[in-house]
């Protein structure tokens, strides 16, 4: 992979994703993804395993026997029981799931931090980020890959300034975390909406009309019939996205679309796990109830919890 391809992959712009003609592009910023598996307990519990431990931890489950799995699951249960009353509530389980899913964000930031804190002072300035990310590429006035790196840099600078709360163009680790992961921070959500509208609003009138909305997620392939999901999206735009029925989405309507706040996946999964494991139906789980359903939480194979336990000590 050459430098320009690498930069493209790492670009913090939300729009640069290519779609096949009949493949739907999803602009919605969901809660941190619990799993890319299908949630179908009738087939397997893969989704639940990913949600409970995080996808990366779940990958290493093949190594342990069921007995080892139960033993180490019991140790994790002790950590989930935040108030140490011997029970795991929906709220405690929800907090654990959110922690497990957000851990990858912090790991991603740690990886990026090492490459951008050039003077190793525990801060990342805009100049450091710019030099580390773009460097001499900006000296090429005519890149042959079709990407405008100067335009990408301007957009990155705007987002960096938004993440940098005190406006000194020097980011702490917390501020830097908001830079590549803006949808995790309420104060960054306006920039997410702005960038999305810039990507889709082809006529630059400050709104997203129906054709721009469809054109962003679907590229018509010659004489092929329009897929059914495209027709559904047209109906969604008219019936739900365009709330004031003026034929276009403004900033607030776009925000409601891409940053929905009416569904909490972590809470839904926590309630599901409690419902499936709560043998006496008292609305909370004992360690025994969880371990008895270890196949739901961690499967018949288990994970290398040694690393998980170390990582979760701070929880």
UniProtKB/Swiss-Prot annotation:
Name of the protein in its database record: Calumenin
Binding site for Ca(2+) 5: 242, 244, 246, 248, 253
Listed SUPFAM superfamilies: EF-hand (SSF47473)
Annotated positions of the Phosphoserine modification: 69, 261, 277
Keywords: Acetylation, Calcium, Endoplasmic reticulum, Glycoprotein, Golgi apparatus, Membrane, Metal-binding, Phosphoprotein, Repeat, Sarcoplasmic reticulum, Secreted, Signal
Assigned GO CC terms: endoplasmic reticulum membrane; extracellular region; Golgi apparatus; melanosome; sarcoplasmic reticulum lumen
Localisation per UniProt entry: Endoplasmic reticulum membrane; Golgi apparatus; Secreted; Melanosome
Sequence positions bearing Phosphotyrosine: 47
Positions carrying N6-acetyllysine: 165
The keyword Transport is assigned to this record: no
Residues reported to bind Ca(2+) 2: 117, 119, 121, 128
UniProt-annotated binding residues for Ca(2+) 4: 201, 203, 205, 212
Cited Pfam families: EF-hand_5
Upper lineage: Eukaryota, Metazoa, Chordata, Craniata, Vertebrata
Motif Prevents secretion from ER: positions: 312-315
Signal sequence range: 1-19
Modified residues (Phosphothreonine): 65, 254
Residues annotated as binding Ca(2+) 6: 278, 280, 282, 284, 289
InterPro entries xref list: EF-hand-dom_pair, EF_Hand_1_Ca_BS, EF_hand_dom
Binding site for Ca(2+) 3: 164, 166, 168, 175
Protein residues bound to Ca(2+) 1: 81, 83, 85, 92
Subunit structure: Interacts with GGCX.
Family: Belongs to the CREC family.
GO molecular function, one term: calcium ion binding
């Amino acid at each position: 992979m050459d430098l320009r391809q690498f930069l493209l992959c790492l670009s913090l712009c939300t729009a640069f994703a290519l779609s096949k003609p009949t493949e739907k592009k999803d602009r919605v910023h969901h809660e941190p993804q619990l799993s890319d598996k299908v949630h179908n307990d009738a087939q397997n519990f893969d989704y639940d395993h990913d949600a409970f431990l995080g996808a990366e931890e779940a990958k290493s489950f093949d190594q342990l026997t069921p007995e080892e799995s139960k033993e180490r699951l019991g140790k994790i249960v002790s950590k989930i029981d935040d108030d140490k009353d011997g029970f795991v509530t929906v709220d405690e389980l929800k907090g654990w799931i959110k922690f497990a899913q957000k851990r990858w964000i912090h790991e991603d930031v740690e990886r990026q931090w090492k490459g951008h804190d050039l003077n190793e002072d525990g801060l990342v300035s805009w100049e450091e980020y710019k030099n580390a990310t773009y460097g001499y590429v900006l000296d090429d006035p005519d890149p042959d890959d079709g990407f405008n790196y100067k335009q990408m840099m301007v957009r990155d600078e705007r987002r960096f300034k938004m993440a940098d709360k005190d406006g000194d163009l020097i980011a702490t680790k917390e501020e830097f975390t908001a830079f590549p992961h803006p949808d995790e921070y309420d104060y960054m959500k306006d920039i997410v909406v702005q960038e999305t509208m810039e990507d889709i609003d082809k006529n630059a009138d400050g709104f997203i009309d129906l054709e721009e909305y469809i054109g962003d997620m679907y590229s018509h392939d010659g004489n092929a019939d329009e897929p059914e999901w495209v027709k559904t999206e047209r109906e969604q735009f008219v019936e739900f996205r365009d709330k004031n029925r003026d034929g276009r989405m403004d900033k607030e309507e776009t925000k409601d679309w891409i940053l929905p706040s009416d569904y909490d996946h972590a809470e839904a999964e926590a309630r599901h796990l409690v419902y499936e494991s709560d043998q006496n139906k008292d609305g909370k789980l004992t360690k025994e109830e969880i371990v008895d359903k270890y196949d739901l939480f961690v499967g018949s194979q288990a994970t290398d919890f040694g690393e998980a336990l170390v990582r979760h000590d701070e929880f």
